[in-house]
From Swiss-Prot:
EC number: 2.7.1.59
Alphabetical list of InterPro entries matching this protein: ATPase_NBD (IPR043129), N-acetyl-D-glucosamine_kinase (IPR023505), ROK (IPR000600), ROK_cs (IPR049874)
Binding site for ATP: 4-11, 133-140
ATP-binding among keywords: yes
UniProt-recorded name of the protein: N-acetyl-D-glucosamine kinase
Pathway(s) of this molecule: Cell wall biogenesis; peptidoglycan recycling
Gene expressing this chain: nagK
Binding site for Zn(2+): 157, 177, 179, 184
Catalytic activity: N-acetyl-D-glucosamine + ATP = N-acetyl-D-glucosamine 6-phosphate + ADP + H(+)
């Protein structure tokens, strides 16, 4: 059995998957915020419960935001302060007496989709998350590409390309990102960025679901906004896809529920790619909230 943990600032979610990659059981508990000992106990107790329930010693994979293992073997995860700065992988491997694997949660999302029955035919899969921020991951032949700093797929921290400024106007404001840089594309393409663009052009403060509802009602202002957003997304993806050249692009995060993104993006991409380039197949993520657990569990399928 494959145990996959999706760990965030508020919850520790465990999913147990069988050899056919089907979810058999899941459980969630609150994430301890201050005590590392309590954090380790929470994970180990869930593993013990799963072992007892299924009568096996399952493999353990963990997806967590941040950098799973720094040069000194410790975790960097600002959203999980109880474990940040601690040798999480080594400590859990010792306590559970098994190989524990860690990866960035965005990489786990991409891995989950790459191992979907429908998508395993594609050698190079790019996962793109359009949510609170913009992130993602790359999976080649069923294995995540992490890079030495676990930042492969941090697409949101690429800066706006020149073509974006041509589209939006050269007086378009370069917003400061939480990472400290100016003009990172997640400030414009995330769910919050989607809402910011609307406010910037129309001086109205609406959340993304409200804007999308107006678009669905045929509101001209909302339709113009969505057109602008999709063109900006295509421009930015043109640069990324020219570098990565994936077979499949899977889009997740809150904005993936907006069908116009997956249905209208493909027709806009070719004008931003090399003439010889083939645009990837574009699909909405299949596994929703379970994606993090799935991808973490499947870290043990990558040998």
């Amino acid at each position: 059995m494959y145990y996959g943990f999706d760990i965030g600032g508020t919850k520790i979610a465990l999913g147990v998957f069988d050899s056919t990659r089907r979810l058999q059981w899941e459980k969630r508990v609150p994430t301890p915020h201050t005590s590392y000992s309590a954090f380790l106990d929470a994970v180990c107790e869930l593993v013990a419960e799963a072992d007892q329930r299924f009568g096996v010693k399952g493999s353990v994979g963990i997806g967590i935001p941040g950098m799973p293992e720094t040069e000194d073997g410790t975790l960097y995860a600002a959203n999980v302060p109880a474990a940040s700065g601690k040798p999480l992988r080594a400590d859990l491997s010792a306590r559970l007496d098994r190989d524990v694997r860690l990866d960035n949660d965005a990489n786990c999302f991409a891995l989950s989709e790459a191992w979907d029955d429908e998508f395993t035919q594609y050698p190079l899969v790019m996962g793109l998350i359009l949510g609170t921020g913009v992130g993602g991951g790359l999976v080649l032949n069923g294995k995540p590409i992490t890079g030495q700093s676990y930042i492969t797929g941090e697409f949101g921290h690429m800066r706006l390309p020149v073509d974006a400024l041509t589209l939006m106007g050269f007086d378009f404001p370069l917003r400061r990102c939480g990472c400290g840089q100016m003009g990172c594309i997640e400030n414009y393409l995330s769910g919050r960025g989607f809402a910011w663009l609307y406010q910037h052009y129309y001086d109205q403060s609406l959340q993304a679901p409200e804007i999308i509802a107006l678009w669905e009602q045929g509101d001209e202002q909302a339709q113009a906004h969505v057109e602008r957003y999709l063109n900006l997304l295509a421009v930015c993806l043109g640069n990324i896809l020219t570098i990565v050249d994936p077979d499949l692009l899977v889009i997740g995060g809150g904005l993936s529920n907006f069908t116009a993104i997956t249905t209208q993006l493909a027709e806009r991409l070719p004008r931003h790619l090399l003439p010889v380039a083939r645009a990837p197949r574009i699909e909405r993520a299949r596994h929703g909230d379970a994606g993090g657990m799935r991808g973490a569990a499947f870290l043990h399928l990558t040998d």
